[in-house]
A protein has these predicted regions:
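Short, low-complexity N-terminal intrinsically disordered segments enriched in polar/charged residues
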Residues: 1-31, 131-133
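A beta-strand edge to alpha-helix "cap/lid" segment located at domain peripheries
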Residues: 1-5, 61-133
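Residues at secondary-structure transition points
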Residues: 1-4, 8, 47-54, 100
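Alpha-helical structural motif
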Residues: 6-9, 21, 52, 59, ...
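Hydrophobic pocket/interface hotspot
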Residues: 10-13, 25-29, 33, 52, ...
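Short glycine/serine/threonine-biased micro-segments
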Residues: 18, 37, 50, 86, ...
């Protein structure tokens, strides 16, 4: 798959996330995708490590119930071979506490044969933890 096709897949996942379309989110993910939000998380209502599309269905369901998305903004896209790196920021409300989380993030998507096999997100874990403390 070409770099542009990989980039398009990531953009489609983001559109799915923004519009709550689970099918669009899961479509480009490999069955055994390795998904991790890097950092120390104790209070947030979702684990940081997920394996496979089935687990990710649960993850995105939990996110939809736990968060109100006020802003989800990918700002920069960097593509190199089988990797797409995206820099962005978000503003979300933790439904359980009513607290607002504003954080910048970097997401690294790794592709093989046109499917996402690995995802890593680097964000402000302290901001997320304080929203649920």
């Amino acid at each position: 798959m070409s770099e542009q096709e990989n980039l398009l897949s990531v953009r489609q996942v983001y559109q799915g996330f923004i519009h709550g379309d689970l099918g669009a989110i899961l479509k480009p993910l490999a069955e055994d995708v390795d998904w991790q939000i890097v950092g120390h998380y104790k209070n947030v209502p979702w684990p940081a490590v997920w394996r496979g599309r089935r687990e990710l269905e649960r993850y995105f369901t939990i996110l939809a119930e736990a968060l109100e998305v006020e802003l989800f903004q990918p700002d920069e896209f960097l593509v190199d071979g089988d990797k797409v790196v995206v820099l962005g920021h978000e503003r979300m409300v933790a439904r359980a506490t009513g607290r607002i989380v504003e954080a910048s993030w970097a997401q690294v998507w790794t592709f093989r044969d046109g499917l996402v096999i690995r995802y890593r997100e680097y964000t402000d874990s302290a901001a997320w933890e304080s929203a649920y403390a």
